[in-house]
């Protein structure tokens, strides 16, 4: 299987490098760069690109409407590069010469959807023969700790490109994106495999489909969710594979067929929006709504009004965890429907609870949301981004109750995501100790950090904040290790939240610099003597800028404290008497 950084020479006559969604720039060997043929082809590619990117070169003779936006294209180029377009344009015999023909992209796609950015990326390859870097605003998420190599926006972007490449018949792109998706399957969360499975099924990508089916079959994904999400024949294959290779009974307890049948009836009643039937089935049977995972199922698949009616029955626990360690709010976060989030919070759902791998509902939402949806400013009278609304609602709820952080469930292993989040928090708190020692100590005392053990990573020691295997307790089981690390993470999150609430200016400085220094061991004396002369000079310059910002933040926090002191002084007896005198004179 190809890796994400594998060059694909078949994709580009200019030897473009096709790496992960950051996805690098073009690389040329010295011998290729001096080859006149390669130079000519590179020049041709750049010139053709101008037809797409330069508004002064708008000589298009047709338009393709994508997400309501017309994209100018040149039929001769599309026909030469794609058999689909060649056949499409052959059928057009009577076209008015006074106006450009218009085509709806959604009418070309029998399945799937391709957004505007994905189609422009596809067109760029059609015109230039080169694969450019993925646009970060739609191929990354807004979780600052994520490496973006297998988050949902990264997967969704490649899935869209696969639909476009398959339906519009560009086989070399199909081959390349199939390798990319195969790599995602083993790295991402199992729920993120489902859109990959669907594109593999629709585009008849047998190898990719088999890999997806195998991954889902060996997971603990809920049987009824699988039946809801995938075609019946695929669901049956997954069921048969699970029978052949039974799952671990500790993580997936055995459920009788009779019980499954009763649960199925309850969930079908939810599918039909028949709340009265749901109530009747629950009343007449010995199964509770929690045992059927009814609330989890409803917040994902039911209409928001139906969800509100189900919650009004008060027959389920909104903080109940399913066998995978997800609460109802975690599932609602995947749905990204603000009204459902609010309904759950009104019923007492805890926004600060974690999954077994250390993610809260906000973390889940951020991993699902791309920067375009999160940062785009909505014009007056236009609909806001639902994902952004959900994130704002949950973050406000956490800020209202910053100290309500329950210890999360513990899994038998420590996922990579938990390690990344811990390293981020350790670096942030460590940086706060360097520049705001007094404030950091107060926040750490509130968070009870001293009562937990520092996380320094599990990899062999190399530099900075990496791990030391000699310090590992060999008597500690994986379950104990995960519990210890989750406790540490809760303490660090309490510390950060306390800092945000009571020392806002210092927190703003940390926010600004954490993004820049997240991949550097800044806490190790800033490593001033590492790197080239130019790099060391830049580090010193950035250090001086950081010192200035720290001093400003310290002054602002100090001014805030003085202002609060003055405010409290204004309520003293003497000031009260002055106010009374003024009142009496009036």
UniProtKB/Swiss-Prot annotation:
A zinc finger (C2HC NPR-type) spans 138-152. Pathway: Protein modification; protein ubiquitination. It comes from Arabidopsis thaliana. Belongs to the plant 'ANKYRIN-BTB/POZ' family. 'NPR1-like' subfamily. Induction: Up-regulated following pathogen challenge or salicylic acid (SA) treatment. Zn(2+) binds at residues 141, 146, 148, 151. PROSITE patterns: ANK_REP_REGION (PS50297), ANK_REPEAT (PS50088), BTB (PS50097), ZF_C2HC_NPR (PS52046). GO terms for molecular function: identical protein binding; protein homodimerization activity; salicylic acid binding; zinc ion binding. The gene is NPR3. Salicylic acid (SA)-binding substrate-specific adapter of an E3 ubiquitin-protein ligase complex (CUL3-RBX1-BTB) which mediates the ubiquitination and subsequent proteasomal degradation of NPR1 in response to SA. Together with NPR4, acts as receptor of salicylic acid to monitor immunity in a NPR1-dependent manner and induce systemic acquired resistance (SAR). Involved in the regulation of basal defense responses against pathogens, and may be implicated in the cross-talk between the SA- and JA-dependent signaling pathways. ANK repeats lie at residues 261-291, 293-320, 324-353. The modification Phosphoserine is found at residue 10. It is found in: Nucleus. This is Regulatory protein NPR3. One of its GO terms (cellular component) is nucleus. Coiled coil: none annotated. Its main location: nucleus. Residues 383-523 are annotated as: Salicylic acid-binding core (SBC). InterPro entries: Ankyrin_rpt, Ankyrin_rpt-contain_sf, BTB/POZ_dom, NPR, NPR1/NIM1-like_C, NPR_central_dom, SKP1/BTB/POZ_sf. Disruption phenotype: Elevated PR-1 expression level and enhanced resistance to Hyaloperonospora parasitica. The double mutant npr3 npr4 accumulates NPR1 proteins (while NPR1 transcripts level is normal) due to reduced NPR1 degradation by the proteasome; this leads to a reduced growth of the compatible pathogenic bacteria Pseudomonas syringae pv. maculicola ES4326 after inoculation, but impaired hypersensitive response (HR) and subsequent systemic acquired resistance (SAR) induction when infected by the avirulent strain Psm ES4326/avrRpt2. Forms homodimers and heterodimers with NPR4 in the presence of salicylic acid (SA). Interacts with TGA2, TGA3, TGA5 and TGA6. Interacts with CUL3A, a core component of the cullin-RING ubiquitin ligases (CRL). Interacts with TGA2 in vivo in the nucleus. Binds to NPR1; this interaction is promoted by association with SA, probably due to conformational changes. Salicylate binds at residue 428. Residues 554-586 are annotated as: Disordered. Residues 60-135 form the BTB domain.
